[in-house]
Amino acid sequence: MYDEALKIQSKPRSFEAFVALLTLERYVNGAIIQWDRIQADKEALPGPGVDRTLMLKLFLDIHFYFICCDKAQNLLGYLSKTDSSQKLVRLWQTLKPNFKPFNDARNHLEHIETRIKKEYLFDLGNLENDTFTFGGERFDISASSLKILTDAYEQVVNILRSRP
């Protein structure tokens, strides 16, 4: 869990950028919490057979994980604009493609009512180890997917911290 935003509150160049940083940290921490919950949910599964309550909990934890990751990427983009830092803009331009899977997965789940069609019905959300599938698309939910987000946040903090 991160607790850096308040320590560097004088570093962002605008009030909006500071609030974006604070909110970004909240969603990064939310993703960490959700990832930990997903791991606990997976460990609690009894093996073959379906415990519907545990599966529902796991599915909803995965959904909120994608929401947190997607919201964090939106806030990172917003922070790069409101802070007017070329370093942050370049960082965002470099990292933006890495966040597309989070956005795509979140879109599927947030707009599930539009996915209730023949082509999706065979896969409205399944789990294969550390891969969540939806409509035949595969989305990584392993530790490396979380690392994309935490590394991005740490790079933002380092850029801001390096300012005089």
Regions found by a protein language model. Name each.
Residues 1-98, 128-164:
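Amphipathic alpha-helical interface segments
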Residues 96-119:
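Histidine-centered, metal-coordinating catalytic motifs and their short helical/loop contexts
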Residues 106, 124, 154-156:
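Surface-exposed beta-strand edges and their flanking turn/coil or helix-capping segments
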Residues 118-124, 129-131:
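Interfacial non-cytosolic loop connecting adjacent transmembrane helices
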